[in-house]
């Protein structure tokens, strides 16, 4: 769970079935390359030829053999608009869009390349003069569970211990959506506390992207715009094969 941090069920309990959308967009027997399964009795896809840049839509993160990758998620509608602009020979720009919400500063995004960075802020609301509510959290942070405490909430408690903010307690009411209530002390200012939360806790964080992908069986560093262009070109080839 991207909000609470709950782990997925064990692999032996998970079964996947392609939806009608996936059958149309992700899988096609005419364009899918196959190989023998581990025992040679069946065939399995080498890769599913997706007709849109799924990598940019859901993002990816990992590290292996001295290379690390961190591709941030993007809005599917904006990806489609950018693809249409590319087909028309027009300029386009792609910026991250996080499922956990919050606001984002993309001025140094650098098209997803190494050396770029984005700043992400939680959404903090005033419920009353002595109660603040965090309803959207920065991407990559979680509200935590009983077995996996939240470093996000811990950062608020530690700031209080150091005297950076003055709060009575933190109440986590997260369910389908994030909801963390921060109850202030009688002498605390809500406006100053919000400023301090952004300055001294994980309510504001910096994320550094690194668009490292496998292209032609070799790792390479691309921009997210390059990934989109490559995907559009590949999709055109797939559509020609389907005819």
Language model segments and positions:
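Glycine-rich anion-binding loops of enzyme active sites
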Residues: 6, 39-45
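C-terminal interaction appendages of subunits in large macromolecular complexes
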Residues: 5, 9-16, 20-21, 25, ...
